[in-house]
Amino acid sequence: MMSLDVIFILKSVIIAIVEGLTEFIPVSSTGHMILVGNLIDFKGQFAEMFEVVIQLGAILAVVVLYWKKIKDSVIEFFKFIFTGGKEGKIGFRFGMNVIIGCIPFAIIGVLFYDNIKSLFNLQSVIIGFIVGGILLLVVETLFRKKNHSTDNIDKITPIQALKVGTLQVLSAWPGMSRSASTIMGGWIAGLNSPTAAEFSFFLAVPAMVASSGKDLFEFDYSIMTPTLWIALVVGFIVAFIVSIIVMEKFVNFLKKKPMRVFAVYRIIMGVVLAVLAFTNIISV
């Protein structure tokens, strides 16, 4: 019995590593967790809740890594309000941009929550991988080097934030990737790649906390056992640690290289999965 518990915890660690590796790069963490979950038989009611919790571990990584920026922006946001705009203008503008950027995703999430949840399957992931990869190639080719004068998140305008937020809606489809969608939105809006990626990190905090809250509130905690609680805590910690490492390296990567390598990876992965599904080697 104990060996089965250890194996289950090891499976949870694998999923948490996958989450940490893929949450903030444009390859879709949800898609990879669904895929790996199918391969190692990590599925079911707990697995769905586990994925929500470890995504919060990844979000905590954003808070820790950018704590000073978040703290200063919150303080300046309220300074601006209470001083009638005499102080804290930069922090207020940044906070409003984050709010504006989250509005489109929030509307879609509220109106189509059940429809979105019904898409969480391997077939949707395959479509998301391929379509998202093609879009990434096209948008990078057309917009990445065109008028990208915005090189700092404090210089982002409300219109730019809205454009990024509108593209974030694409990530409601499993396999599309929230990171890919927001970075593409950043390119279209005139942000350079590192700035688009960093703004994507900040948009992730309210978007994912809000979407996770409903799932955690509705979860049936009566099924929880000591093994499941251990898996949950360990998974959260692992996702947090891996996410911090990946975020720093990803921003540095974007300062030097294009993202087409991720686009090609997505397309190849999608085609391979489609072939495996068509030949019944894996089930969708």
From Swiss-Prot:
One matching Pfam family: BacA
Keywords: Antibiotic resistance, Cell membrane, Cell shape, Cell wall biogenesis/degradation, Hydrolase, Membrane, Peptidoglycan synthesis, Transmembrane, Transmembrane helix
EC number: 3.6.1.27
MF terms (GO), sorted A to Z: undecaprenyl-diphosphatase activity
Gene Ontology biological process terms from the UniProt entry: cell wall organization; peptidoglycan biosynthetic process; regulation of cell shape; response to antibiotic
Domain of life: Bacteria
Membrane disposition: Multi-pass membrane protein
Disulfide bond annotation, renumbered to this chain: none
Transmembrane segments: 6-26, 46-66, 94-114, 119-139, 183-203, 227-247, 262-282
Signal peptide span: none
InterPro entries: UppP
Compartments where located: Cell membrane
Reaction it catalyzes: di-trans,octa-cis-undecaprenyl diphosphate + H2O = di-trans,octa-cis-undecaprenyl phosphate + phosphate + H(+)
Cellular compartments per GO CC: plasma membrane
Family: Belongs to the UppP family.
Matching NCBIfam families: PRK00281.1-4, undec_PP_bacA
Additional comment: Bacitracin is thought to be involved in the inhibition of peptidoglycan synthesis by sequestering undecaprenyl diphosphate, thereby reducing the pool of lipid carrier available.
Role noted for this protein: Catalyzes the dephosphorylation of undecaprenyl diphosphate (UPP). Confers resistance to bacitracin.
Protein name: Undecaprenyl-diphosphatase 2
Organism whose genome encodes this protein: Clostridioides difficile (strain 630) (Peptoclostridium difficile)
Gene name of the encoded protein: uppP2
